[in-house]
Regions:
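Bacterial N-terminal signal peptides that target proteins for export
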Residues: 2-13
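C-terminal motif of bacterial Sec signal peptides marking the signal peptidase cleavage site
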Residues: 23-24
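Long, helix-rich interaction regions
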Residues: 28, 32-36, 45, 79-180
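Buried hydrophobic core positions in alpha-solenoid tandem helical repeats
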Residues: 40, 67-75
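Residue-level detector of extended alpha-helical repeat arrays and alpha-solenoid scaffolds
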Residues: 50-53, 68, 96, 100
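Conserved hydrophobic register position within alpha-solenoid helical repeats
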Residues: 55-56, 103
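Electron-transfer interface patches adjacent to heme c in soluble/periplasmic c-type cytochromes
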Residues: 59-63, 94-97
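Residue-level signature of the C-terminal ends
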Residues: 62-63, 74, 110-114
Length: 180
């Protein structure tokens, strides 16, 4: 009797282990065609995002406007990340890659319908060139995050013929920032 119970317990433990193995493998898989923001952010932070593309030039996941609110949730995290899915030429100007700034770039790319710029770096509007000295400070990036949040919140309310707001669809309007 005891060996029969022990055998059944062993069978159940085996089934549970197999099920746990398969479910844990699928949770961390990132699908570029149907991306999940949480998985994207976690893999960027851990450096485990598999960049897809040819010749080491990555391409962006197919995020949509439905993802903007979730992307904004993580945008104030200025953790340094090792890589971001853009062509390597984008990093030639140097400077650290900050998660939040790259997520804002992703949002801007969704807004425009194409890549916002050559890289996920913002510079001052009056920058003479794209050297690192013109990149935004952490405080300025956080200001840009708030501007994007205000823009997104404002987009929830319909624009009418009486709306007089030149910055209605320009998150960085009125700031001294632009995409590199």
């Amino acid at each position: 009797m005891n060996s029969r119970i022990f055998s059944q317990i062993k069978s159940w433990i085996y089934i549970i282990c197999i099920a746990a193995t398969f479910s844990s493998c699928t949770q961390g898989v990132f699908d570029y065609e149907h991306p999940d923001v949480e998985i994207f952010v976690n893999q960027l932070k851990s450096g485990k995002l598999a960049i897809q593309g040819t010749d080491q030039a990555g391409y962006m996941p197919k995020f949509t406007t439905d993802d903007i609110e979730t992307l904004l949730k993580y945008a104030d995290d200025l953790s340094e990340i090792p890589a971001f899915p853009l062509a390597p030429v984008s990093y030639s100007a140097g400077g650290k890659l900050r998660l939040g700034e790259c997520l804002l770039w992703t949002i801007e790319s969704i807004r425009l319908g194409h890549n916002a710029s050559m890289g996920c770096k913002m510079v001052h509007v009056d920058a003479e060139d794209y050297e690192g000295i013109y990149f935004l400070s952490d405080e300025e990036v956080l200001d840009a995050v708030q501007r994007y949040r205000n823009w997104w919140e404002g987009r929830k309310y319909p624009r009418t013929m009486w709306t007089i707001d030149p910055c209605f669809d320009e998150p960085l309007c009125g700031s001294n920032y632009m995409w590199w």
